Structure formats: C-alpha cells, structure tokens
Amino acid sequence: MTRFALLVRGINVGGKNKVVMTELREELQTIGLDGVETYINSGNIFFESASSKAELVDLLGHFFRDHYPFIQSFSLFSAEDYAQDLASLPAWWQEDLARKDVLFYTEGLDQDAVWELVSAFSLGDEIIHRGNLGIYWGKYSEETYTKTAYHRQVLKMPDYRLLTIRNANTFDKIGQFLRKS
C-alpha cells in the first residue's frame, strides 16, 4: 500500500463550493481508498491505496465529475514523491521568510509551460524554486508583498486555476500526514 496526498482546489472558500469533509472521507472510502484522513477544510486529503497513480487519477477524476463537479483540478502525489521534493529544496526554504508558499501542479497541467511563464517574471523581493510537485515561492518582506510578482502576476496566469496553493505550514503538515502509516 502506498500513502498518498490528494490536494483539491477551491473548496470551502468564501462560502462557495462547500464540501463536508466527513462526508467526503466516507465517499472516498466507498470507492476503495483506505485510511482516508483530512486536514482542515481546504482540501487536504490523505489515504492509502494499492492502485497506481494513473489508476487513482482516473478514479478520482470520475468521482469528482460525478459527485463534486466544481472540483475540476487536483494534485495527487505519494509520500515518496513528497520526500524527494523535500530533499531537493534549496537552503532558503528553511529560512525565516515573510511568506513561503507552494504552487502545487495539478494533474494534466503542462508544468514546463507554467515554469517558463513564472521563471520569466521580474522577481522583486522574492525567490522561486522548481520542484517536481510544484513551484516553491519565498517572499522576503511583508512590506513589499503587494509589489511582488507573486501578488501581482500569479492570479493573472492563464493556468492559475490549475494550481493549488498551500503555505509552508500546510506543506509541513502534509509531510506529517504522509509519514503516518
């Protein structure tokens, strides 16, 4: 059995796209996922499965289309995938920056095209790293946050809706859930 994280985008935000996590956990168990757990109400789901990632992407895609049609994109990765990305993070990720976020790639996203766009941004008081799971973004100063490419340009990206963003604290919590057995 492999432990997976499933990150869904845009649920329970501002009273829109409401999902009751206890119901979602039960529904995911009925389609064959084991040990389903959630963390906060923003779409951080953890489970175990003997199925391949490709099989799970297909299964979950059909499940969301049938039961939660507003969930149109999600990120799925294993505990091993997470550990590999964590091991390759640059030193600045461990520094005490004003803000740190991960822009997780969702399934089917053209990661190269997104990176090409993001890496061309004129970065101000910020730094980025391309990981296998997403783009790691650090902002050095809270005072200059509104002037950063992150604040000004990410929302305008054509593929913005195909990214799901988590802050560094949630990224760390994802790791804790993935290490459970």
Which functions belong to the PLM regions below?
Residues 2-42, 46-181:
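Surface-exposed, charge/polar-rich loops and edge strands
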